A protein has these predicted regions:
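Surface loop/turn signatures of beta-propeller and other carbohydrate-active proteins
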Residues: 23-35, 66-86, 109-151, 170-173, ...
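Beta-rich accessory regions
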Residues: 22-67, 87-89, 94-107, 126, ...
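Beta-propeller domains
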Residues: 55-64, 141, 157-158, 162-194
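Bacterial Sec-dependent N-terminal signal peptides
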Residues: 1-23
Length: 572
């Protein structure tokens, strides 16, 4: 029936491939935008976006069938930015057209008058030159479009692979796809495209990837195998595999491989468990985690669940991770379960909590009492934390989404939205009878420093503060905007006040003072400043705090009250 309808639609508009591209208006909300064969030879069709416009639902038709579908806020009366629809996706196809339904109350003449029709244009290039004052220099960001959770992190052959929740057709959440970037140093990243795109099973939500060294899946030795959530009416788990180091993926013909009617059933994270010689997977299901095992990554056995009555339950549990690590200064090894939660964070919105205990491949047992909640980062803007598979030397390298669901869609950027945290190496330490997660900047951040240190604050730098007792650190600019950080040695707390940091009117939830326990004294703070973010970490790993800031001008002044001394390194 769909094929007959599309054929009739094309015939109604008098469409042939020889016509120049044009819009034919079929009803108050319906248009067919035809693309000539000549135009298909160009690189991309630039779609004009207006962020406060109604959503348009676009189906790409070729050879009398639907080959792609996505949503975009086509410009109504002005253009905020353009996004590309790349023509190479449709190479060799004929009869290409966009079947467009624009939501909203339009008469036929009103639809015809929208700005988008005259602004759509073909181009042999898409300009990715940065136009944003707040885009960071040494944090990963998408060149354009929206990004949230990091996904499918793995290391192979000297390359760090970062996939991420991505909207290629706008800078707000929509059209969930896996974007892909690579790096050789965890600091400088190169965008590699969108290797896992939505399909008939659903849009592509969060998941993980592993290097299958022993070919347990049958996809080939050292194949990269990804599990992700297919989001449709229900959320199910699907698989894709790569035999070219993660550049391209083939979706498994047996998808979905795990189904459920449970809402919020998502974000599979898998890893090889040497203790049981099997794969384990941890999966978020509402407000608890489910644990599975497998011999081949395709067939999964339910083992147990964890989380009822443990930790914070102020929101949905998401983006889990589970890993074994040594406890600093002891001969102990413990397992840590990461559980991202939204809402329910210590200062509102989203945050990363974790649990420490034992895991035998079948069941996770938490060491702490159920009412104990531990946070990995005490800022407002650190979420969806996950680690890289196959990291060298047994390291547990983590990256997070650097934003908060309370305002992520409204922050004052348009070309792109959201970045990732700096990479951090995780570990464990003991303090007063509890075991906590240690978080330190990855050594790659030290390697990125300039050779010489100075006192001048720049908009993208690392500030190292050596402390001897209480200290107050203030970053400010000529506009009077400032961020105040305070360390109280006696109380064992560190706080950051961004209530006068700059632009805040985009959300009532942005202004905040965040406060963290330090689990003992801090002798050195490492503060990473990168245009629109401040990450403060104890050099020994006992405290981490991440907050976004949007000063109208860069902070160019620093004062340290107390006995602390500081140095500033540029990050290259």
């Amino acid at each position: 029936m769909k094929k007959i309808f599309i054929s009739a639609l094309v015939a109604l508009c008098g469409f042939t491939a020889s016509y120049a591209q044009q819009a034919s208006f079929l009803s108050n909300n319906h248009c067919l935008y035809r693309i000539s064969q000549e135009s298909q030879n160009q690189k991309c069709l630039l779609l004009p976006v207006q962020e406060n416009a109604e959503m348009a639902n676009i189906k790409v038709i070729a050879d009398n069938k639907q080959v792609k579908a996505f949503n975009v806020k086509l410009a109504k009366d002005h253009v905020d930015y353009f996004v590309p629809l790349y023509m190479d996706e449709f190479a060799g196809l004929k009869g290409l057209a966009l079947d467009i339904h624009v939501n909203g109350d339009y008469n036929k003449e009103g639809l015809n008058a929208l700005t988008c029709w005259k602004e759509m244009k073909f181009s042999d290039a898409f300009d990715m030159k940065n136009r944003e004052q707040y885009r960071p220099d040494f944090h990963h960001t998408p060149a354009y479009g929206w990004m949230n959770d990091p996904n499918g992190l793995f290391y192979k052959d000297g390359v760090w692979n970062l996939y991420f929740q991505y909207n290629p057709y706008g800078s707000q959440w929509e059209n969930m796809t896996w974007g892909h970037s690579t790096s050789t140093d965890l600091v400088h990243w190169k965008f590699q495209g969108t290797p896992i795109q939505p399909d008939a099973v659903g849009t592509i939500f969060s998941g993980s990837a592993v290097v299958d060294k022993n070919n347990t899946s049958g996809f080939g030795k050292d194949a990269v195998v990804a599990l992700y959530t297919s989001a449709a009416e229900n959320q199910t788990q699907s698989m894709a595999y790569s035999t070219d180091n993660g550049k391209t993926f083939t979706k498994y013909e047996g998808n979905p491989i795990i189904t459920s009617t449970v809402p919020d059933f998502r974000d599979p994270h898998m890893f090889w468990n040497e203790g049981i010689k099997k794969w384990n997977m941890i999966l978020a299901a509402g407000q608890h985690m489910e644990i599975y095992s497998s011999d081949n990554l395709k067939d999964w056995k339910y083992e147990s669940s964890f989380g009822e009555k443990y930790g914070n339950h102020g929101g949905v549990w998401e983006c889990p991770d589970l890993m074994k690590m040594k406890v600093r200064g002891t001969d102990k090894e413990k397992w840590m379960l990461i559980c991202n939660i939204n809402p329910g964070g210590p200062f509102g919105g989203s945050a990363t909590q974790y649990f420490v205990g034992d895991f035998d491949g079948h069941k996770f047992t938490c060491d702490s009492k159920p009412e104990v909640t531990k946070w990995m980062d005490y800022g407002k803007d650190h979420y969806a934390t996950v680690t890289f598979d196959n990291a060298p030397e047994g390291r547990r390298v983590a990256i997070a989404w650097m934003s908060n669901w309370q305002y992520a869609n409204q922050v004052p950027t348009q070309q792109y939205r959201s970045g990732n945290s700096i990479p951090r190496d995780l570990g464990l330490f003991e303090y007063k009878g509890e075991t906590y997660c240690s978080v330190v900047p990855s050594p790659e951040m030290t390697a990125a420093r300039s050779k010489k240190a100075g006192k001048k604050l720049t908009e993208s730098c690392e500030m190292v503060v050596n402390l001897k007792g209480n200290a107050t650190i203030t970053l400010s600019n000529d506009k009077g905007e400032k961020v105040v950080m305070n360390y109280d040695a006696k109380a064992e707390t560190f706080s950051m006040d961004r209530t006068k940091s700059g632009k805040m009117d985009f959300s009532k939830d942005f202004a905040a003072v965040t406060k963290a326990p330090t689990y003992g004294n801090i002798s050195q703070l490492r503060i990473f400043i990168d245009k629109s973010s401040i990450e403060a970490l104890d050099a020994d790993g006992k405290m981490a705090m991440t907050n976004l800031v949007f000063p109208s001008k860069p902070y160019n002044k620093v004062t340290v009250k107390g006995k602390g001394k500081y140095q500033v390194y540029d990050i290259k």
